Every structure is written in structure tokens, then in C-alpha cells.
């Protein structure tokens, strides 16, 4: 009867109080864990970026990651890490991205003073693991789609299926197009920011880098 109802109400209230307590404690713990891991994650990301910059524009004696420049093209913001040696500008690493088969493909591309590609590093991707690991090496020196030494200012990088000069990753034209788009865009950002004459990279208009319509992802 009434006693049982009261007991039930009382135990329900207790349960709510306990659950609320658990939620608050769990939330606080999560926040604490987030705080604990935030710094190491940020440090790991910073180290990964510094390592990638050293791969794509070797030979600098400054700290390019310290003060990146940003440039906006077509509503997209690009980060440019300038490399110098003995105070002389030797090139830059540009962070760029494009949408591949599974999502964003983030690439760091290194250019010398003239705008030639030195190397690249695939920072992150949402492709299937096989495609991602292929893209990480495919366009490197000695790879089937080697882009090193090429200058997108002289000729935009286009996959052979679209009449270009770059061999597509086996069975993945979409990932290849996305990658090359990211590289072309990186060059556009690189040449666009060099208004001070510190680079011999030819500024290119964005239209020059527009790929054939059938190649858009």
C-alpha cells in the first residue's frame, strides 16, 4: 500500500541522487583525464609536424613550426612554414588538404625557392588503410607516381587518366586526384604568399590549377 509506495519513492530518489553523483564524478574524471592527455597529445602533434617539416624541406637552421604564416585562397586557410638557413630563405612546407574517397587527406608539401617539389608527408587521411599507406609512398622519389622535382607553377599536376603526367595509385584514381589537388593548392598558397620577392616561385592564378571537371572528386 502506501508504505510500499513511499519506500519505492524513497529508493527512486536515492537512485537519482546516486546516479547524479556518479555522473558528476565521471564528468569531472573525464575532464581531468582530458586535461592530463591534452598536453602530451599537443606535444606529440607538434613533434610529428616538426619531423614532417624536416623531411619535406631539409637543411634549415630556424624553427619553421614556430611561426607559420597563413594564407586564405577560395575560403580555405593554408599554413606555410618558412625554412631559412643562415637567414636566407630556402623554401617552405605548406599544409594543404583535399577530400579523398573517405574524407580529408592532409598533406604537407615542401617547395624550394623556385617552387619545385622537394618532398611531401601525408599528415593524416580517412582513406582505407591500404590506400592511405600507398599514398604515403606512391608519389615519393622512386615511387610510381613520383612528383619530386616537379613544379606545379609550370604545369599543374594532373593524373594520367585526365590527360596528365602522374600515374594514379593502383585502383584509386579518386585518392590520387585528391592528393594532387592538395599539392596543386599547396603550390597556389606558396606562390601567393611570396609577394616579398623572397621566392622565385611563379605566382599562379587559381584558375590555372583548376583540374578538368570530370576529375573533381
Where are these regions (language model features)?
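Short extracytoplasmic
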Residues: 53-76
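Flexible, solvent-exposed short loops/turns enriched in glycine
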Residues: 98-105, 113-172
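Structured beta-strand/loop patches that form or line metal/cofactor-binding pockets in enzymes
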Residues: 76-108
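Alpha-helical transmembrane signal-anchor/signal-peptide segments
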Residues: 38-51
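Short, Lys/Arg-enriched N-terminal segments with co-localized hydrophobic residues
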Residues: 1-5
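Internal alpha-helical transmembrane segments
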Residues: 6-36, 40
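Extracytoplasmic/periplasmic C-terminal soluble domains
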Residues: 152, 156-205
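Conserved small/polar residues in nucleotide/adenosyl-binding loops
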Residues: 206-213
Amino acid at each position: 500500500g502506501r508504505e510500499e509506495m513511499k519506500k519505492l519513492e524513497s529508493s527512486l530518489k536515492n537512485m537519482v541522487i546516486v546516479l547524479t553523483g556518479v555522473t558528476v564524478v565521471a564528468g569531472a574524471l573525464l575532464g581531468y583525464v582530458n586535461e592530463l592527455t591534452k598536453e602530451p597529445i599537443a606535444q606529440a602533434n607538434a613533434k610529428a609536424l616538426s619531423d614532417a617539416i624536416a623531411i619535406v624541406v631539409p637543411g634549415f637552421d630556424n624553427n619553421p613550426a614556430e611561426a607559420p604564416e597563413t594564407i586564405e585562397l577560395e575560403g580555405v586557410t593554408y599554413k606555410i612554414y618558412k625554412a631559412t638557413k643562415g637567414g636566407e630563405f630556402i623554401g617552405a612546407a605548406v599544409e594543404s588538404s583535399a577530400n579523398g574517397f573517405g574524407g580529408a587527406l592532409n598533406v604537407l608539401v615542401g617547395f624550394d625557392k623556385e617552387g619545385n617539389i622537394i618532398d611531401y608527408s601525408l599528415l593524416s587521411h580517412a582513406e582505407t588503410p591500404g590506400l592511405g599507406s600507398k599514398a604515403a609512398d606512391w608519389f615519393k622519389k622512386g615511387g610510381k607516381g613520383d612528383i619530386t622535382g616537379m613544379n606545379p607553377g609550370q604545369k599543374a599536376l594532373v593524373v594520367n587518366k585526365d590527360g596528365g603526367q602522374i600515374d594514379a595509385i593502383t585502383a584509386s584514381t579518386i585518392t590520387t586526384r585528391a592528393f594532387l589537388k592538395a599539392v596543386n593548392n599547396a603550390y597556389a598558397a606558396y606562390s601567393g604568399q611570396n609577394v616579398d620577392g623572397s621566392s622565385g616561385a611563379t605566382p599562379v592564378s587559381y584558375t590555372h590549377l583548376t583540374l578538368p571537371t570530370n576529375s573533381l572528386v
